[in-house]
Amino acid sequence: MPRGQKSKLRACKKRRQVREELQDLVGAQATAAVGEVFHSPSSLCFKSSPAAGSYSVSQGPQGAISTSTTAASVSHTRSNESADNQVEERPRSSQAQPTAEPFPRGPLDEKVVKLVHYLLYKYQMKELISKAGMLRNVIQMYRNHFHEILKRASEHLELVFGLDLKEVDPNRHIYVLVNKLELSYDAMLSDDEGVPKTGLLMTILGVIFTKGNCAAEEQVWQVLNVIGLYAGMEHFIFGEPRKLITEDLVKEEYLEYRQVANSDPPRYEFLWGPRAYAETSKMKVLEFLAKVHYTVPSAFPAWYEEALQDEEERAQARAAARAHTAAMASARARAMTSAHSKGITNEHSRAMTNVHSRAIASVRSKATQTIPPTPNKV
């Protein structure tokens, strides 16, 4: 076979392989990086100590923030097998949750997870985050690895909870956590402990986007099973997942959950809701998914092209809205100017009428004064 044809065949094979891998794109969140903070409840929590401004690490199930300290390593093959075995159309609440194999962790891995807990605590308390505080309360003797630990913790926060860590004061090294959604999703749907659920929502939106903007319920549950969420099984962060995604998120209009037409027995599917379109975009969701794969959105040409088209349509809609607003403002300004002009004209007319009336009255008064009095008859 000629060399050129071999090269083309290799290229075609590679593209086909990439397409196959993309079919389970979001399932990559079952890797250890996400499993460290997603799969099982933690015995580790941060709480305020009596000394103002200091924090301590305590053991036990109670605490302000409780996230996973047990990493889970789930291979791509095992994830699919688990999903196939666990997904049902309407799983029973007695469904047993598969146990994840322990994933060996070193000291730096432990520090990453502890830093995630610490940052979530600060987010819950609505407090600024300082480098000094992270070094003092979490990093400690591993300060030479601070940047590596912070980078990995930031990735966890983004992929699992949908939070971005941003430095707001480079001189003092002050940071804040910012929700990836534009509006107040966390304030509305966070649980009692203030743990954000934006990452889960972005994951589901990603599944819908990558399945042609409409995902079968089974496809969504396959991905959620991979990251440790099962219908009917109470989750330590998200509560009962089925209620969350088929009721809460639907009620808040982030998701649309509908029966597939003419399906017997009934089957259901998910679409983006109007608030999802308003508060995020296909490009933002694709950027989120790309980070899961440690790549860039353009690595997925078909979805990237669709996201670019969506961005262009949004830009045109914003431009049209601005033009409409400007036209309305201009019309109101003209109306006000016209009304003001009419007011001035009417006022001038009234003033002239008053002047004319006063002039006539003055003339009459003078005329009366100049007429001599009639003499009395004797």
From Swiss-Prot:
Keyword Disulfide bond annotated: no
A single GO cellular-component term on record: nucleus
Residue stretches making up the MAGE domain: 108-307
Database matches in InterPro entries: MAGE, MAGE_N, MAGE_WH1, MAGE_WH2, MHD_dom
Biased composition (Low complexity): 64-77
Gene Ontology process terms (BP): negative regulation of transcription by RNA polymerase II
Tissues with expression: Detected only in the melanoma and testis and not in other normal tissues.
UniProt keyword Nucleus, yes or no: no
Keywords: Tumor antigen
Domain of life the protein comes from: Eukaryota
Region Disordered: start-end pairs: 49-105
Protein name: Melanoma-associated antigen B10
Organism of this sequence: Canis lupus familiaris
Taxonomy of the source species: Eukaryota, Metazoa, Chordata, Craniata, Vertebrata
Annotated gene: MAGEB10
